[in-house]
Amino acid sequence: MAKWLENAIFYEIYPQSFNDTNGDGIGDFQGIIEKLDYIKETGFNAIWMNPCFDSPFGDAGYDVRDYKKTAARYGTNEDIKRLFDECHKRDMHILLDLVPGHTSVEHEWFKKSMLPEINEYTDRYIWTSNIWEQPEGLNCIRGISDRDGSAGVNFFSSQ
């Protein structure tokens, strides 16, 4: 464990509702940057930011479409780099909420897992052996691909 974590006091931010600087009704990275001094002055030395990756937002950003790109509604990849830089200037740390347990059905990995041919993505998601099978306790979406089987979902059909 990193040494700084022993004394970390986290301020959790859901970017969508935090601070809107461009008037579109949605919080953004610039809005977080604007409030860093306030956050620091109130005694926090770390930020835990809820999902900010590219997403169709079927589940508040937890249905990630691309882990390498930030959600455009919050800003650009350059904007988030600036947010990290501004945190570091204030001796603050920032952690991003990463949800590796599921992705959006629009994620490239899921799309590749939908192919009928076996590939490196075939087993990255839970699929039944045929479209009619539904194991007890597993919600499934059927008929979404050429693959024979139904995809198991964690929460919503969008993930």
Model-derived regions: residue spans:
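The substrate-binding groove and active-site-proximal loops of carbohydrate-active enzymes
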Residues: 16-29, 61-77, 159
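Hydrophobic faces of well-ordered beta-strands that scaffold small-molecule active sites
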Residues: 9-12, 47-49, 94-96
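Hydrophobic or amphipathic alpha-helical targeting/insertion segments
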Residues: 83-111, 115
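Conserved structural scaffold segments of CAZyme catalytic domains across common CAZy folds
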Residues: 1-33, 37, 41
